[in-house]
A protein has these predicted regions:
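Regulatory, non-catalytic segments
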Residues: 2-175
Length: 175
């Protein structure tokens, strides 16, 4: 009888705790105030990242839109690639994955990523995977059409409001 009471009490406690848990951001968010900061030098601890972006099978067949990428850590270090797409190749085709080498300042653990799209075609990324020398590989699950003209993505940094004020950037990306 005592064991049953303890079991019910533990079940109730688990349900109570889970019902009060804070949700994590599971959908990408727009970030209108996001700024690329070009104030610092591009040679500040140069690292190379591999960024693999998979395009959803429910995206359009191919996009000619311009796609930019920015990612970084909770300490304000930012890596920026102003244009990943290549209008002369088959970049960002439906059901495909494209990998890019992006050079930029060395970050700690990457905790945010934003994509920016300009153009009329539209595009639906599935995942963005970032591999860096000083951070564990990280995958962000977009699975949504990118709106045009606004930074759109995820920010899991603990100091979400402070990273854009002291960030550094790079502008070299190659496929």
């Amino acid at each position: 009888m005592l064991i049953k009471a303890v079991h019910y009490l533990l079940c109730f406690a688990c349900i109570y705790v889970l019902s009060h848990a804070e949700p994590i951001i599971s959908q990408p968010q727009s970030f209108a105030s996001f700024k690329i900061n070009n104030d610092t030098t591009q040679n500040e601890g140069s690292c190379v990242y591999t960024v693999t972006i998979s395009t959803s099978c429910s995206s359009i067949s191919a996009t000619r839109d311009h796609i930019s990428l920015a990612f970084g850590d909770a300490y304000g270090i930012q890596v920026y690639a102003p244009r990943l797409d290549d209008p002369w190749s088959s970049t960002f085709e439906r059901c495909s994955a494209d990998s890019f080498r992006v050079k930029g300042p060395c970050t700690h653990q990457i905790c945010y990523v934003y994509l920016y799209r300009t153009g009329r075609d539209g595009w639906k990324p599935d995942t963005v995977k970032i591999f860096g020398y000083y951070s564990k590989p990280v995958t962000f699950y977009f699975r949504a059409f990118l709106p045009g003209g606004i930074w759109y993505g995820f920010n899991y940094c603990s100091s979400a409001s402070s990273f854009s004020s002291s960030s550094s950037s790079s502008s070299s990306a190659s496929k």
